[in-house]
Amino acid sequence: TTVDQTVQMLKAMKVAGFAPKVVDLAQQYYDPALASSGVAEGAYVLTNTQPFEEPNAAIDLYNQWLKKAGGGTAPTTLGVESFSAGLLFAKVAGSLGSHLTRDNLITGLTKVTSWDAGGLHPSQNPGQNIANSCVLYLQVKGGKFVRAFPDKGFSCNTANTAHVSGDFGKVPVEK
């Protein structure tokens, strides 16, 4: 669902008198439109990037580029992840110089086993397709996002994740 759809759902819940103890939302809801909606007070939002509300040089750089390219677009976690991917591409492509080919780029990307995009997010291992187990929760208070957990940094305990085995990429085709 989109942020707008979720805001509409939260409005409908309020009208119906339904007030759950916890509203726990995923990272795509780290969007000023949710916080300023007037119906998300107290909602928790998971993120795996540095909060926009806290000082961070890498987030400042993202915001500078967003301002140049975005035409007034608000920063979002998904935007930060896209920016990180672009930085990773630029780093590896730049290191190849005149040897930039598709195969060399893929080989170069598989060699990157620690990537934090200069501090945009906790380090992860894109070369081996291994995400980190780090989380950070924000909470909507007074129409703004504030840090809820942990007090600083990220919680990077492996207990934050669960291993699920199986091939979830194949959808059976009905005949």
Feature locations, PLM:
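Stable alpha-helical elements in mature extracytoplasmic
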Residues: 2-9, 55-62, 82-85, 92, ...
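Sequence contexts marking disulfide-bonded cysteines in secreted/extracellular proteins
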Residues: 133-135, 155-159
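Extracellular/periplasmic periplasmic-binding protein-like sensory domains
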Residues: 10-83, 152-155, 167-174
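A short linear-motif detector with a strong N-terminal bias
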Residues: 2-4, 22-25, 114-118
